[in-house]
A protein has these predicted regions:
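Periplasmic/cell-envelope proteins involved in peptidoglycan metabolism and beta-lactam response
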Residues: 1-294, 310, 319, 394-404, ...
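Beta-lactam-recognizing serine transpeptidase/beta-lactamase-like catalytic domain environment
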Residues: 73, 202-214, 260-325, 329-561, ...
């Protein structure tokens, strides 16, 4: 028998139910308020993420031009191929896999496996194919009713001059980001702002036929105009390439041409080079042969090393012992301090002993009594040991630093060494001072040496080397001009004038006779430095630095052949003619008239002038 609840109990229960219902309604209202107002942005963002597909439209990188307007780096159209297996007709998966494999050189079975994964809405087929390949894929799809293959227009970096200036320009990766050279140093400036296309899609990721598209157009990056003159660069690359082949240079060669008064780099080459359009292809035949002879892990390691070697800008990144070219620095410092003058006399005998270590000139030739000028002409080690001793280690180290040989030059290129290898005064004894005075026992970069010699001849100013003269807007208009920078005054102007006279004497009467140019006054200095860290005790670097016109200095050319295998390793014989060829073409190109020049005609040195093969230290 059912019991009837008392009225007061019923009302109490009704109130409880009503309260619970009201609480639930209030909670629901609060939650709805939170969802609609407080969390509206979050859910809107999630919804848009599901309803829209954004396709990036890559921006072109900024263009790079030479000083004389030659296009060095630009962009070319290419196409990236992608597939959406969800959208591909199931009955045509095999046909699509076979056709695309044939066009793209891919594995058909692997493609079919990708296409059979119906959960996938996007898979990459091939990056950056050319127009012909993209057209073949498009024709295949249209002829066979294959849907789900997307052909997206893309952009890739293009170097219209091929190997020209490759070590300076560098290259980009598949994402169009700079990897080396100017492409890396100025990556942020050259990189543009990507565009985007937004397309509506359904819940399964299919593009809606009755959808909308919105587009933000890409913006091209800013461009660069270089100090590099394409004509002078051609002169340097051609002459250096011939020298590398003629003298069987094993460890690449370096050439630098600079404006001595501004620090602007007019040409820079590391030879052999590579093609930045195909940076992973080894262009040095000898290195390529060595790699191809290996297999497995050894081959992969050798290939990586060969690639990194050819990408390396030796002129900026490598250190070397400058040899007798460095005598210009020792001589300039000694003259500037008053430790010696042009007519100070020194004696060169069979050898000289310093703290129990005997030194001799590389050709074992006794020069006898000679002035400082004659010692420079003869590149006499013994005399420069005595000059270094008069200068003293404190002053020597002070000028070494003042010439910028202990710090990066600050050039606007990547991978410059943070410091060179040198002795400080507290670590330098008499033997170290002796060997450093004639260019051994210290290591500097090729660019540091070139910049230091510019300071020797330009009135004593150390100028910061640079390769970019202007920043350009995408339309070619000027954004910023880069002005030359003087780091410091190193020498007195009169010391620099004296050094110019002495350097001309080296070319007229000394070891630089092969750098003479008919109708132009030239100054220079040779060097043949031993590679003390090489397993081959006969390994040498043959170098020469030349400046013209020496009476009104404008252009410097430094040429270094690393490990030549020729009839000699003397820089005055192998590298001086290269400097002469490059400078003569440059002077003519720049419209500098010839004039009568006193002095001897270029002559090949005799055997007595050349260093003996077994010498332990540098000679002329």
């Amino acid at each position: 028998m059912l019991r009837t609840l008392p009225e007061h109990a019923f009302r109490r229960r009704a109130r409880v139910v009503a309260a619970v219902f009201c609480a639930l309604c209030l909670g629901l209202a609060v939650r709805l308020f939170s969802l609609q107002l407080r969390s509206d942005g979050w859910y809107t963002h999630r919804a848009l993420g599901q309803q829209l597909r954004d396709t990036v439209v890559p921006a072109d990188r900024g263009k790079i031009y030479s000083a004389d307007g030659v296009l060095l780096a630009a962009n070319s159209s290419c196409w990236t191929l992608r597939a959406s297996p969800r959208e591909m007709p199931e009955e045509k998966l095999s046909l699509a896999a076979d056709g695309l494999a044939d066009i793209l050189g891919l594995d058909a079975a692997a493609l079919l496996e990708k296409f059979s994964d119906r959960r996938s809405n996007d898979c990459l087929l091939r990056y950056r194919v050319d127009r012909e390949t993209a057209d073949k894929v498009r024709d295949l799809c249209e002829a066979n009713g294959i849907t789900g293959i997307r052909i997206n227009q893309d952009s890739k970096r293009w170097y219209p001059q091929g190997q020209f200036l490759a070590s300076v320009l560098g290259f980009t990766n598949v994402d169009n980001a700079g990897v080396s050279g100017l492409e890396l140093k100025y990556d942020g400036l050259l990189t543009g702002e990507n565009g985007v296309v937004l397309t509506a899609v359904n819940a399964w990721g299919y593009t809606l036929e009755q959808s909308y598209e919105t587009e933000r157009f890409p913006t091209e990056g800013d461009g660069l105009r270089l100090t590099i003159d394409a004509n002078i660069q051609h002169y340097l690359e051609n002459a250096l390439g011939y020298a590398v082949q003629e003298h069987h240079v094993a460890a690449r060669a370096v050439g630098i041409v600079m404006d001595v008064n501004t620090g602007a780099v007019l040409a820079m080459s590391t030879t052999p080079s590579y093609d930045p359009n195909e940076p992973r292809v080894i262009f040095d035949a000898a290195a390529r042969t060595q790699v191809e002879a290996l297999s497995g892990g050894a081959r992969a390691a050798a290939l990586q090393l060969a690639q990194q070697t050819q990408w390396r800008n030796k002129a900026v990144s490598d250190l070397y012992e400058p040899g007798s070219v460095f005598k210009l620095i020792t001589c300039a410092a000694a003259l500037d301090t008053g430790a010696v003058n042009q007519h100070s006399s020194f004696y060169c005998g069979e050898s000289i002993s310093v703290a129990g270590t005997r030194f001799h000139c590389a050709n074992h030739k006794r020069h006898g009594a000679q002035t400082v000028t004659q010692a420079l002409e003869n590149s006499c080690n013994q005399s420069f040991i005595q000059i270094g001793a008069r200068l003293g280690k404190e002053a020597f180290c002070s000028y070494f630093a003042a010439f910028g040989l202990r710090e990066p030059t600050g050039i606007d290129l990547p991978a410059e060494p943070k410091k060179s290898l040198y002795y400080t005064a507290d670590r330098m004894g008499p033997v170290e001072l002796a060997s450093c005075a004639f260019g051994q026992s210290s290591k500097v970069s090729y660019l540091e040496m070139a910049a230091a010699v510019c300071a020797v001849v330009n009135g004593g100013k150390l100028m910061q080397p640079y390769v970019v003269s202007d920043i350009l807007a995408p339309d070619g208009s000027l954004i910023e001009h880069i002005a030359p920078t003087c780091t410091r005054q190193v020498l007195k102007a009169e010391t620099s004038a004296t050094m110019r006279e002495m350097m001309e004497a080296v070319v007229l009467y000394g070891g630089g006779r092969n750098a003479q140019i008919a109708g132009y006054r030239v100054g220079g200095k040779s060097g043949t430095s031993q590679k003390l860290d090489s397993a081959d005790e006969k390994a040498r670097i043959a170098s020469f630095v030349a400046v013209a016109p020496i009476d009104d200095p404008q252009f410097l050319c430094l040429v270094c052949l690393d490990e030549p295998h020729s009839w000699t390793t003397a820089g005055g014989s192998l590298s001086a003619p290269v400097c002469a060829e490059v400078l003569e073409q440059t002077l003519v190109y720049k419209g500098i008239p010839r004039a009568a020049v006193p002095g001897a005609a270029p002559t090949e040195p005799t055997a007595a002038d050349l260093p003996a093969d077994g010498d332990s230290f540098d000679g002329a």
